[in-house]
Each structure stands twice: as C-alpha cells, then as structure tokens.
From Swiss-Prot:
Record's function text: Member of the two-component regulatory system DesR/DesK, responsible for cold induction of the des gene coding for the Delta5 acyl-lipid desaturase. Acts as a sensor of the membrane fluidity. Probably activates DesR by phosphorylation.
Limits of the Histidine kinase domain: 186-369
Protein name (record): Sensor histidine kinase DesK
Topology within the bilayer: Multi-pass membrane protein
Gene3D superfamilies for this protein: 1.20.5.1930, Histidine kinase-like ATPase, C-terminal domain
Lineage, uppermost ranks: Bacteria, Bacillati, Bacillota, Bacilli, Bacillales
Length: 370
C-alpha cells in the first residue's frame, strides 16, 4: 500500500510558499561567479530546486526519495560551485514534515553527510567567499541538525491532539448514547406498567359510565392519581440527568455572540439559589435557543441577558436591538420558540415575546417545580 508521508496543504498552509520568496538570495551568490557558463548552470539549478521543492511537498510513496535525493544533490552542487549552503534550511524543513520514520531518517542523515562533506570540501579549498561566511555556515549546519526533529515533534504533537480531540468527541457520543439508553430503560420500567394500568382503567371506566357511574368515577379518579404519579416520576428521572448549568451556558452564548460580532451585555446580580436541576436545565436550553435566534434571525448588534431571582420564580430576559419583519403571532410559532414554550410549560413556566424595539423574550419558571 502506498502511504502519504505528509499532506502539504493541510499541515503547512502557505509557509512553504513564503519560504519560496527567498529564492532571490541564491542569485546573489551566482552573480559572484566569473564564468558565464557557471552562472547559467546556477540559475538552472536554483529554478530546478524550487520546482522540485514544490513537488516534494505533495509527493507520496517512493517518490519522496526521488525528490529528496534530487534536492540534496542540488544543494550539494550549490555549496561546491557557489558556496551557497542555505538550501539546507529548506531541505531541513522538508525532512521535518515527513511522517514516516524510515524515509525521515534516511534523508536526514544523507542530507547532513552531504552538506558536511561539501562544506568541508569548500573549507579545504579555502574558497575566499566561503570563508567569509563561516559563522553563518555553522548556524546553518546546526539548524540542519536540529530543525527536522523540532518540526517533526511539533507535527506529531498536532496529530496526537487531533486524534485526542476525535477520541473525546467519540467518547462524548458514546456517553450520550448510554445516557439515552439508560433514560429509555428508566422510562420503560417506570412508566410502562402505569401507562398500561391507565389504559385498562380508562377502558373499564368507559364501559361502566352508564352501568355504574359511581364505579366509573372511582376508576377515573384512580387514572388521574396514576397520571400524576407518573408525571412526578418523569420529572425525577429528568432531574437525575446530567443537566446544563446556567453559568456554563452563559459562557457558551458569550462565545457564540462574540463569534457573530454581536456585543454581549450581562450584569451579574444575585444568582438564583432555590432552583431545581430540572428547571435550571430547561432554562439553559431555552437560553441557548433564544441566543441562537438572535444570531441567525435578528441582525442585531447587541444582545442583553438578565437573570433575576424573584420570590416565586426565576426570570430570564433576552433582548436585542435587531429587526423582525412579520407579525408577533407568526414569530412565536417559529424559530424554535414553540419548543421553548413547551419545555417551560412542562415545568409550569411561561414564555412572553415582545417584538417592539427589537425582540425581547421573557422566560419564567418556578423556583421549584411541583
């Protein structure tokens, strides 16, 4: 199987293109040559190097060796002919982006040996132009030694972070699935029998309504009591779920509004204390839905959130300075507001909508649902 050793576009962005801008520098060294033939050869080698360099970054399989050795050969020739060692920076960066261990080490050591031999050859010949660059030559060789490992380490860390993020998302999905299955089991075990009982008693009351009205009334009263018990058990099950806290949701909506370039205004007052987890969870979901509507539909510049703890209820107000075209009745039926109203009414809460001077949603829910 042929493997991709690295992905140029995804992992590197425009960085290699920025590096390519520096292709002008080799021409300075080429013009220092006295021979026209050598100058022509130098120009060809420089243009060839950057062309190969681009292809090397999108190579895969065995071609990575072909382009890698060709780059090293051009760099070695440039050191020998023009005392230009700085192609080593480009090659070191290229090698550092190789994912696979074997080609990384092969090209790394071949590059180091060839660069060191070519530099030593120029040093032995005592080329004057090369000797004036000795401090920069040393820096370049040190970079050629360290840079590939530094880049490879950073790329490995980025890949591990991506894998970790994917794993966390998968775990979160599995947790949600397990939670759904648990809730389904609890609802089945808790409500299945009672709903069957309600159905049987309702059917019995229907048959007795003319024959024995008093017995039918008793059966209907029993149905009513069973329904209330079932509702309380549903609320207990929902309350036992891992809820969304209001403070966490405030952080989330702040990030959402900032990303949409909408000013978020919130002045923290006395935080609600006497509120059940179920009611807090319902308010958090409604708050998220309300802010999502602001971002998607209002074209607002500012969004204000107020949370008040009253004697009998907690009130959250979400207001914006956006515009809404249409009637309030049609507005209240769309944009997820029907679901918000149903959630709040489930906990004996309420939703009020005002579309004058922007949009204002007022959500109220009892301190403790009964």
């Amino acid at each position: 199987m042929i493997k991709n050793h690295f992905t140029f576009q995804k992992l590197n962005g425009i960085t290699p293109y920025i590096w390519t801008i520096f292709f002008i520098l080799p021409f300075y060294f080429i013009w220092k040559s006295s021979s026209t033939f050598v100058i022509i050869v130098g120009i060809i080698l420089t243009l060839l190097f950057f062309s190969v360099y681009r292809f090397a970054f999108v190579s895969k399989g065995w071609t990575i060796y072909l382009w890698g050795f060709l780059l090293i050969g051009i760099s070695t020739a440039s050191i020998t002919l023009f005392s230009y060692i700085y192609f080593a920076f480009f090659i070191a960066y290229f090698i550092g982006n190789i994912k696979e261990r074997v080609p990384f080490h092969i090209l790394y050591y071949v590059h180091l040996i060839s660069a060191a031999v070519a530099a030593n050859f120029s040093l032995v010949l005592k080329k004057e132009f090369f000797l004036t660059q000795i401090p920069f030559v040393v820096i370049t060789l040190i970079s050629a030694i360290l840079l590939p490992f530094s880049i490879k380490s950073r790329k490995e860390r980025e890949r591990l972070e991506e894998k970790l993020e994917d794993a966390n998302e998968r775990i979160a999905e599995l947790v949600k699935l397990e939670e759904r299955q648990r809730i389904a089991r609890d609802l089945h075990d808790t409500l299945g029998q009672k709903l069957s009982l309600i159905g049987l008693k309702s059917d019995l009351a229907r048959k007795l309504i003319y024959k024995d009205p008093e017995q039918a009334a008793r059966e209907l009263k029993s149905v009513q009591q069973t329904a209330r018990t079932s509702l309380n058990e549903v609320r207990k099950i929902v309350s036992s779920m891992k809820g969304i806290r209001l403070k966490d949701e405030l952080i989330n909506i702040k990030q959402i509004l900032e990303a949409a370039d909408i000013m978020f205004i919130y002045e923290e007052e006395k935080w609600p204390e006497n509120i059940s987890l179920l009611n807090e969870n319902i308010l958090s979901m409604c708050l998220k839905e309300a802010v999502t509507n602001v971002v998607k539909h209002s074209q607002a510049k500012t969004c204000r959130v107020d949370i008040q703890q009253l004697w009998k209820e907690v009130v959250i107000t979400v207001s914006d300075d956006g515009t809404f075209k249409g009637e309030e009745n049609s507005f209240s039926k769309g944009h997820g507001l029907l679901g918000m109203r149903e959630r709040l009414e489930f906990a004996n809460g309420s939703l009020h909508i005002d579309t004058e001077n922007g949009t204002k949603l007022t959500m109220a829910i009892p301190n403790n649902s009964k």
